Amino acid sequence: MFILASASLSRKKLLRGHRFRVVPSGVREVRRKTLQATCVTNARLKADAVARRFPTEWVLAADTMVAYGGRIYGKPRDRKAAVRLLRALAGQTHTLGTGVVLQKGRFRIVKFVTSKVTLHDDPPVEKIVARTDPTQYAGGYAIREKNDPLIRRIDGSRSNVIGLPMEFLEPLLRKLEREAPAPVKRGRKVPLKGYILV
């Protein structure tokens, strides 16, 4: 059992099969100089906010952003902004990054994962934006299972583009469900390869 510090429907769907409850963090997102610093900082802020309220429970927090042309993009403020962004990304490859934090009290496991996303050359942007709420998604878009009218190719984790890198999270969450890990002292190695204690 853990707490998901997000109200994202996409993340809740990805976590089906796991026992969790939702407690949105209510944290205002910040921007840093790099995609990794931005995503990881926001995920840590979200995890901290919820972990302070529930210090004995595991908290899962995440933040997803898009980087293109030297700029970092989160959720567009409205449909017009989403249309402008998607037109700029059309036919191009951009980087989507997700910072993930799994935290219990003061102890954190941190992961940052990127995927490369290439859009079609001339996607029906207005139609896509009209039938979804682009203000709920980083970059202003969600992906379909098949025949996506917007996305031509994804290099890397597909679930990461949806909202969580499940290839990395799944074994970790299963391990937490099987075991009741004792607190890990700062500075000791994490018994899960590929994760960082910070």
Predicted features and spans:
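N-terminal beta1-alpha1 ligand-phosphate binding loop
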Residues: 1-20, 24
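Short, glycine/serine-rich, charged loops/turns that create anion-binding
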Residues: 9, 27, 107
